[in-house]
Amino acid sequence: MLRRAISVGCSALAAMGSLAPAHAQGEPDLRASYTVVGDGIPKPLTDETPNVENGRRIVTDRQQGLCVLCHSGPFPEARFQGDLATNLAGTGARWSEAQLRMRLVDAARLNPQTIMPSYYRTEGLERVGWQWRGQPVLNAQQVEDVVAFLRTLRDTP
C-alpha cells in the first residue's frame, strides 16, 4: 500500500512539472564551455544567430522553459502566470546579455538559495531524476534564444 502511494505521489509530481532535457536519451552531450566573468557569461554559448521568437516560445511554454510558473510578463498568450519571481517586463533594461545568460545557465551561482533551476549547468545538482542526470534543460542555442528574447523586454511594468 505504501509503495502504491509513493508511486502515485511521484507520478503526480512528475506530471506537474518535470523539466524535459534538451536532448533525447542516447544523443551526444554537446554542451559548450563557458567562462564566468563577474556576474555574467559574456560570450554566447553558440555561434548561431539567436531566434527571438523561439526564445519567446520557450519562455511561455509550460512543458519546456516553465518560466511562467514563477514569472509573469508581457505575454498575453501565457495564461496563469506566476508571482513567485520577478516580472520579466523590463528584463532587457535591468540586466545585460551576459547577466541574463548567467541567470539561465546557473542562477544558483549568483544566489545559492534560489529556486530557479539551472537550465544549462548539469554538475552538482540535487533531486534530478536518473533519466535527466547530466543533461541540460535547455541546449546552448535555446539558452541564446531565450537571452535574445529577454533582451527585447525593455519596458517596465
Task: Spell out what each predicted region is.
Residues M1-G9:
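Bacterial N-terminal signal peptides that target proteins for export
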Residues A15-H23:
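C-terminal segment of classical bacterial N-terminal signal peptides
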Residues P28-R62, P157:
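Electrostatic cytochrome c docking/interface patches
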Residues T49, V68, S72-D106, I115-G129:
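Gly/Gly-Pro-rich "capping" loops immediately C-terminal to redox-active cysteine motifs
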Residues P50, N54-R57, N87, W95, ...:
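Extracytoplasmic/secreted proteins, especially bacterial periplasmic and envelope-associated proteins
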Residues T60, A93, V105-R109, A148-D155:
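Sec-exported extracytoplasmic/periplasmic mature domains
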Residues R62-L66, P74, Q142:
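Short pre-active-site segment immediately N-terminal to redox-active cysteine/selenocysteine motifs
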Residues R101-R103, Y119-P157:
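C-terminal capping alpha-helices of c-type cytochrome domains
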